Amino acid sequence: MRPFAIALLGSVLIAPLPAEAYVALMAGQQAKPLQGSFNNVPVLHSNQPEEVHGPGILVSTTPGSAIAAETGEPLANAGYTFNGAFGLHVHHKYYPNDRSRMGSGRGRRGELTLATLLINPGSRPVHIRFERGAVRNSFEAPYLANNLMGVKPLGVRPWNTGPGDATAVQMLRGQLDRKLQDEITIPAYSRIVLFSTQLPAKGIANGLLKGKSDGPFQMAVVAAEDPQSDADLFSVLDQGRLAPGRIYLSRLRQIENGTVFSRVAGVALGDTYEASVSHDLEQGALHVPLTSTNRHNFGTGEVQVNALASRMVDSSLNNVGTYGVRFDVTMNLRGAGPHQLVFSHPTANGRSRFTAFRGSIRIETVDGYEDVHVGMKSGESLPLSSLNLRPGQNNPVKVSLVYPADATPGHLLSVVPDQQLAELRRREELLAAAQAAKKIPSKTATVAPAPPPVAVEIEPITMARPMPQVTPPPQWIQPPPALPTIQGMTPAVISPTRMSQSLLERYQQAVQAQQKLMDSLMGR
């Protein structure tokens, strides 16, 4: 355990949480595993390479192999034949090797066409019906990293925050994009283009689909620059060359031992994760992992990642991102009064905060349902909904989301009393104030100048004027008569003794004033 560093703000001590409690909301509390499960619906994931540098095959489930642009060596396909319910997830970015296609200056950016091909290897036509799905590119759904942060209500027309979020909300609501066909037939021994989309240099494209076939078929995802027809797309598949950008080919051993995750190019088993948990809130707050990983499972040891049925050699070993997977979690709660449903992402140790999630979440209670859009940075805990629990009965709360691409899995879902969230906010404000205070540059310490001498008012000393010498009058002059007493008062007489005492007091005052002045100059 790392040592604690304690910050003092006023009379409040602020200490960072221990390493294992990296979501502040659950400090001193424990998470419990959901113990849910994935279904077995096969889903083709085309996400490796994420950044595509030119034309070629991205992933194919047909038998055989294709030549890697980086090594010139053949790589085995992710062979798989679909039959029945299936899914598709495509997510790629275009960064061309040909710099002239980047559109520097006023030049037009080049475009890459992504296409999904359906192949029927059999002697009978295969009919496919699509239930839900959408395809979006950067033109249709611009990606702005810090747009729409926080929690916002989601109306009939969803927020537009990037291709990954735009397709996920369509899947969450069970809608099929009007640009896609709801039914399609693949003739025997034939292949067709399911969809294609164009993305500009530095652009992103994402597709999510769920369907069901009445027979066996295979799929491939290809990239082409400036194709003129479907035949040009089929030609990419026939040439048998992989698109450049497979940066993990030099790290295959690290993928195998789990030190590098890579991304997914293969078929995952499972398009839905379902779980149910019961909890008495009188015994404490509820914390459960959602989209947990090996690294972020909050002490439960539960990893909510589904397996792959087939994969390219440079693909991750499992569906590590769970992109496109629907999570349905039902919480049966007992308790009373106001509580908060909170969605969190752990603090990023050793790195700056980043956008960890931008997507849509549905919350269902006995009072109905609401959809919200969530934009979250790492280390944040955001309240999704206020819950008013009825005492003495079960209070079911269901949370659903389709995990969007460009998010970082490993979240925590919590139900806590209102005051627990309020206390967290207070601590965050104090910590923010302490951090802001630390950023204020300290001024160079200087020795304060000595204070000026204390001004001492010295009373002036009036010296007695010498008595003039009196010449005695001649004897023949008669002395003047005595002055008469005015109203019974005798003439004033200053005795020599009294005058000497007054003068002494004035001398003493002068000495004391001088002493005070000397003391002040010596800094006493």
Model-derived features: positions:
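Sec/Tat signal peptide C-region and signal peptidase I cleavage site
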Residues: 17-21
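Long compositionally biased, domain-poor regions of proteins
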Residues: 22-31, 61-131, 136, 143-144, ...
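Activation corresponds to long, low-complexity, non-globular regions
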Residues: 25-53, 222-290, 429-430, 478-480, ...
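Acidic, proline-/serine-/threonine-rich low-complexity intrinsically disordered repeat tracts
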Residues: 432-488, 492
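Bacterial N-terminal signal peptides
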Residues: 7-16
